[in-house]
Amino acid sequence: MPSPLLSPLGLGAHSLANRFVLSPMTTNSSTAQGHITQEDLAYSRRRAQSAPLQITGAAYIHAQGQLFEFGPSLAEDACVPGLAKLAQAMQQDGAKALIQLTHAGRFAEPYLRRQGYVYGPSPMTLNSPIPHQVKALDQSQIKSIIGYYADATRRAIQAGFAGIELSSAQRLLPQSFLSTFSNQRTDAYGADSLENRARLILEIWEA
């Protein structure tokens, strides 16, 4: 019996030849400003035939949420030309390319080194990589972050990606709102119900 892994799959408007996916892997090979380099392109070209669906490593939507020092950026329009080359490299052999959107929240180490603090759902004191404070986002800041996700998605589509993946695991900002450990809020994004804890993610998708 043929393996289901080898069966075609419909994904929205896209048809995939099989069900293999090249998962997001961070290479830390972009510039310090998050622009795509020749190394990024070479990496993607070498893997263009590996799976019909391919996902980039963490692309940050705003400097406040940058996860890796040399990760790709979707934070400004100036990044689009380089990202267009990346999308083309990933899709040169017929694959569909997604770009992973990331806000690192309390794990935004590059922002921490520049500012001395990071943001999350609620105030916290952390000791890694250095002792530091997590500041609580107010609702106006949350609305701004939702806008950053929407702008980043627009740039991704403009660059030629087939879609986006919203990174919502690994204690990054969206997951931090889902967790009652990191989310101690009492407002509409608060910890008292799953509906409230999931509100940020749902509003990002609606944006």
Language-model features and meaning:
Residues 20-23, 54-56, 97-101, 164-166:
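Hydrophobic faces of well-ordered beta-strands that scaffold small-molecule active sites
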Residues 96, 102-161:
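Non-globular sequence segments
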Residues 71-98, 181-207:
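Alpha-helix-loop-beta-strand connector modules within alpha/beta enzyme cores
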Residues 22, 47, 90, 99, ...:
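Conserved, mostly hydrophobic/aromatic
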Residues 32-46, 72-92, 109-114, 139-154, ...:
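Glycine-rich anion/phosphate-binding loops
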